[in-house]
Amino acid sequence: MTPLFHLENIVRTYPDPASRDPHAVRTVLNLSELDIRAGKILGSRGHNGSGKSTLLRIIALLEPPDSGTVLFEGRPAGTDDLHLRRQVTLLLQTPYLLSRSVASNVAYGLRVRGIRNASELQNRIAASLLAVGLDPAVFLHRRRHELSGGECQRVALAARLALRPRVLLMDEPTASVDQQSAERIALAARHAADSGSAVVVVSHDHEWITPLSDRLVTLREGKLVE
C-alpha cells in the first residue's frame, strides 16, 4: 500500500552561527528514507537539535528540504500546495490559544475551512473535546486564563482533531503538561490513528512515546536510527 508521505534522501541545512564564514552551513537533517502511513503512529525521539522539529516542518510542508524527494500518495508535494497543506495539521509544544472561549478556539479552524452550519460546528467541537478528555458541559465556555497548561494543550489538540486531518503532527506535546493530560493526549493520538489519520509524534520522553508508537525511530545528529 502506498504510504501517505514518502521522504527520500532529505537534506536540510541552516546557516552555522558558530562559524565566521557567512556561507558556512550545518546539516540538521540527513534522512535516507521514511514512510508515514495512514492509521499508524510514528514516534520519533532524540535530543534537542537532533532534527526532530525540522522533520515535522518538512512533513507539514512549512519549509522545503535543500534536496530530496517528498511524495504524498505517490505525487510530489511542495510548500506551495495549499490544498495538501490543509490535510496536515501540526500541534506545537507551546499551545497558542485565542483569548476567547474554548468553543471559539476549537471552532476557529473550522470556520476558516468554510464550515458555518451551527449543528455541525457544535457536534465537531463537542466530539473533539471529548476525544481529549474535556467535558464540553464544563469547558465549552471557559476562557484561556481559566485553563491549566495541560488543559490549554488539550484544547489546542481538540482544535486540530476537529479538522479531521489526514496527517496529525505533534511536536513535544507533553513537554509542559501534567500526567493526566499526557495520558489523554496519548489516547487522543491513538483514536486519531484508529480513525485513519497518520500520526507523527516527536518527543524526548521515552517512557511516554514508546508504548504509544506503532513504529519508533531515533534521530541522532539528523540521521535516522531504528
Annotate each PLM feature.
Residues 76-89, 112, 194:
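ABC ATPase NBD coupling module
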Residues 143-147, 151:
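Conserved ABC ATPase signature
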Residues 60:
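Helix-to-loop junction immediately C-terminal to a conserved catalytic motif
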Residues 168-171:
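Catalytic Walker B motif of ABC-type/P-loop ATPase nucleotide-binding domains
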Residues 45-47:
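The feature captures the beta-strand-to-loop junction immediately N-terminal to the Walker
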Residues 203-204:
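H-loop/switch region of ABC-family ATPase nucleotide-binding domains
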